[in-house]
């Protein structure tokens, strides 16, 4: 499957788009120039032809595609495989958190981390809060900024099922950090929660107005009614 995915992506490579895409990501890793619609279109038949037999094979395949990367789109494809509907049961298995941690730390940039955080870690947290929340609280204080950003943004999309105590803990663990991606992530997570509970966001931003960075505060309150 891995070789077929790489070949399928290479077959639709667009050199004219590759350089601008790489420049946008500010990454040393080259791009093939395959945008998301084309990537999903070529992946669909490959994933339909190959059905992985068990969770271990699924994880091994995701890791193989991710770790053997030559082009950025191959890692996007690894994430697509990880969150494919055929493997939803394995994706929300608590054992998969170690895989997601690997993708976060090895990916180490916002495009990879945000997808893993919101599309994989968030649903896993929703499925197994008692097992996942303690890990996220540890990550919120980890030296790795991408683990910390994950804890802040992973509940985006959970709406009414958001664990606001966990969200507050993860935000407060990083509220004084000057890192742009943490400050932006805090504002984004709070702004998204406005859609479900504006009163909670208003109370939180009022209570911590003096500590929230101007960027976080501006983003968090931008859509408050």
PLM features: residue spans?
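Alpha-helical scaffold domains
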Residues: 1-225
């Amino acid at each position: 499957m891995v070789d077929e995915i790489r070949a399928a992506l290479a077959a639709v490579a667009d050199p004219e788009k590759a350089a601008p895409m790489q420049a946008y990501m500010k990454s040393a890793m080259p791009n093939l120039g395959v945008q998301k619609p084309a990537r999903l279109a070529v992946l669909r038949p490959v994933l339909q032809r190959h059905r992985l037999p068990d969770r271990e094979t699924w994880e091994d395949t995701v890791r193989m595609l991710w770790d053997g990367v030559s082009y950025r789109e191959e890692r996007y494809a690894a994430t697509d495989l990880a969150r494919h509907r055929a493997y939803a049961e394995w994706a929300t298995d608590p054992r998969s958190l170690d895989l997601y941690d690997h993708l976060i730390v090895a990916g180490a940039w916002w495009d990879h981390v945000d997808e893993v955080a919101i599309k994989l870690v968030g649903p896993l947290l929703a499925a197994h809060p008692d097992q996942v929340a303690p890990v996220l609280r540890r990550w919120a204080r980890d030296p790795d900024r991408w683990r910390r950003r994950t804890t802040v943004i992973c509940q985006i999309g959970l709406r009414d099922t958001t664990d606001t105590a966990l969200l507050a803990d993860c935000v407060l663990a990083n509220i004084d950090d000057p890192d742009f991606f943490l400050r932006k992530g805090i504002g984004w997570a709070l702004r998204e929660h406005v859609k479900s509970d504006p009163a909670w966001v208003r109370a939180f931003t009022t209570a911590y107005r003096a500590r929230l960075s101007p960027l976080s505060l501006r983003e968090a309150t931008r859509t408050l009614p």
